[in-house]
A protein has these predicted regions:
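Short alpha-helical segments and helix-capping/turn motifs at coil-helix boundaries
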Residues: 10, 43-46, 116-117
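C-terminal segment of classical bacterial N-terminal signal peptides
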Residues: 12-21
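Composition- and surface-driven signal marking solvent-exposed, interaction-prone regions
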Residues: 1, 20, 74-75
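Mature extracytoplasmic domains of secretory-pathway proteins
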Residues: 57-125
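Low-complexity intrinsically disordered segments
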Residues: 26, 94-169
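Generic structural motif
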Residues: 50-52, 65, 90-92, 137, ...
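Bacterial N-terminal signal peptides that target proteins for export
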Residues: 1-8
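N-terminal secretory signal peptides
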Residues: 24-84
Length: 169
């Protein structure tokens, strides 16, 4: 039994690929109960904030449903794929390194096995806009549910406006 479990854990690590370079864990902004559950945790909507670790001056807020009940309280529930996303410029934009279109900005597990939420980023070079996409996927199949947010790169104080197209690999 231990061998099977160890194999599954190893396979999950290989399938998920290398972890993105994350500067920090997301900050919980607030939670709001949506379904009351007697004697067990309620179902909730949780709103988090995260700064883009590779592009200074951009922050994203996302809201995810969190299941309550016994399985949710034990961390065993598979969460649904309904995730909303809003990203904004919060300071002068500074690119730390070159990026590829669709690079993972943030990844989080959404179930005990094989389901994860990902925020990926790209650049619309023609419009000089950063584009962020959140979606969830599983080992075998993903969900078509997604949310997109655009961040036009605007002047901030006296700083020069960088062109995101110059930072694509």
């Amino acid at each position: 039994m231990r061998g099977i479990l160890a194999g599954l854990v190893l396979m999950a690590g290989l399938v998920s690929g290398p972890a993105p370079a994350l500067a920090q864990a997301p900050d919980l902004i607030f939670k709001k109960s949506t379904v009351f559950r007697f004697l067990t945790p309620d179902d909730k909507l949780a709103t988090y904030a995260i700064d883009d670790p590779e592009i200074e001056g951009v922050a994203c807020h996302y809201t995810i449903p969190e299941k309550g009940g016994i399985s949710g309280g034990l961390g065993l529930a598979e969460e649904v794929s309904d995730i909303s996303l809003a990203c904004r410029q919060v300071g002068p934009i500074k690119f730390k390194s070159k990026m590829e279109q669709g690079d993972v900005m943030f990844r989080q597990s959404r179930s005990i096995l094989f389901k994860r939420m990902q925020i990926v980023r790209g650049c619309d070079a023609k419009r000089n806009v950063l584009v962020y996409l959140v979606y969830s996927d599983k080992l075998i199949d993903g969900s078509p549910k997604n949310s997109t947010s655009s961040v036009p790169i605007n002047p901030w104080g006296q700083s020069e406006i960088p062109k995101c197209g110059e930072w694509i690999k």
